């Protein structure tokens, strides 16, 4: 069974997110630094009648990178072609996509860090000079064909910016770091979602739900759906702070937004390794999770909330982790 706090997309959530997706920057809640910069770059590109410079959006899953790509296309008044790194298996796949673009269009590549190197190399000249050279045929009869491309904007999204090659990263003129959402912004998102789906929710309930949603809109919207079920069955249909606390407690989501896996990580560090330092590989084995899963899904939030510190020797549980789980902490 999937974690309810998993920030990767589940089931029918793609349809839900499309329904909730804002259309323009003025409707987009949060990520103010990224929005303010994009507003300037977009307006400048429109005034010059040029394609917007290529954009790299990076950050943990569920923070609105795909939504931002659609918003950028809407602000520019152009079409968006969407694909993902794992889907583009060979250079010919990329050429076919690029060939369909109209002047000024946006090409959005999700998980761009997963592009094969052979595909990435074709992308270099397309991004920099709007042309591609491809080989037609095989053996002695093969020949190089030069294709001019219309000016376009590539928007790449990644959860692992460190895995991008330097040549690819250098070709993005605009970068946007999507960060975990502030509590006030996430509360507003919960209230907006409830309004769109005609749910009755108090401000206190929206605030509590936002507090436990790990700074991630995708998780907040998922929890809202589950809390609505509790409100219908255990209450009068109104989502208030009492039913919200009861529902999230039953779902093993505590007041810091930690679930049983997060707590297992911290308890393992404290009980088995006296708080650390402990290596990521060792920790992963002890909690029966893949190293990459711990590093990408669990650790970022635990670090951001101050429960774990990274050191040269390994991960260390902080005094806050001890206090949160009811352990006595002593300085080493």
Swiss-Prot record:
It catalyses: ATP + H2O = ADP + phosphate + H(+). GO terms for cellular component: cytoplasm; Holliday junction resolvase complex. DNA binds at residues 291, 310, 312, 315. The keyword Nucleotide-binding applies. The keyword Glycoprotein does not apply. Mg(2+) binds at residue 66. ATP binds at residues 20-21, 62, 65-67, 128-130, 171, 181, 218. This is Holliday junction branch migration complex subunit RuvB. The lineage of its organism: Bacteria, Bacillati, Bacillota, Bacilli, Lactobacillales. The gene is ruvB.
